[in-house]
Structures are given as structure tokens and as C-alpha cells.
Amino acid sequence: MRIWIDADACPKAAKELVCKFALKRKLEVWMVAGQPQVKPPFACVRLVVVESGMDAADDYLVEQAEPGDLAICSDVPLADRLIKKQVAALDPRGREFDARNMGDKLAMRNLMADLRDQGQMGGGQAPYAERDRQAFANALDRLLTRLQREADLRASQPHR
């Protein structure tokens, strides 16, 4: 299992938490970005800066991630593409994307984009706060535990 991060939009505090969890669990972290980033100084972390272009980082992430991997992203359409590929997805505020909630999340994202385009709504999300970091840490721990159990179960079953 690998952890993928949509690095352009991920808060630094969330990236740091992912690295701590990855070190503890001996997992690889792949940070994918469309812009240069500072790579955390850990051997388990890889940084890929893709050529610029609309959705180039998203496309790379979707192409490279495999079923059973985890992606950290706040981009709802990207999460939808990953979920369809059986890659788990979690946003940096601790909210998990899954097949059950994806339709609602896409509809809400589209509604909010329309309201912003019409000038009826301002800005984006609130600043990343300590409660967001804590919610993310808790959700990340739960999700990694679940994914590891599922991977162990798959590995223990005889191949046909």
C-alpha cells in the first residue's frame, strides 16, 4: 500500500502527519504536484512534479495509484476518479470519500461552484485549524488500520 498526496492543495500540517504515520507503519508516500514543492527529508517520501497542464497532477495520480492505496486530496472530482479505481480517498480535514457519499459530494461541489460563479458566495474553505489537523490524524489512523487489515486479508487468501 502507498499513500498518495495531491500536494499542491494539501496543507503542510497534513503532509507532515502523513509522513509521521508512514514512517511508523513503514509505508511509501508519493507527493504529486504541478508546482515545485519542498520534499520532506524522509527516505519514505517521493516527490513527483509533473509537467504543467490542466489536471496533469490529477491524471498522474489516477494513473499510478493502485487499488488498496490511499490518496489524500480535497479535489472532489479527483476523489471520484480514485474511488472508481478502488483507491481510498481522504481529505486533509478528515472526511473520507467513498462510493456511498460521492454523488452527494459531487452535487454539493457543483452547487457551490455555480453559486461562486454567480457571485452569490465568496471564497473557499476556512483556514486549516488544529481541530482539522486532529480530525485528519484520527481519520488517517482509522483508515490506514482498515486498509492494512484488508491488505493482510487479501494476502492470506489462496490465489485461484
UniProtKB/Swiss-Prot annotation:
One Pfam family assigned to this protein is: DUF188
NCBIfam families assigned: PRK00124.1
Q: Which family does it belong to?
A: Belongs to the UPF0178 family.
Q: What is this protein's record name?
A: UPF0178 protein PA14_69280
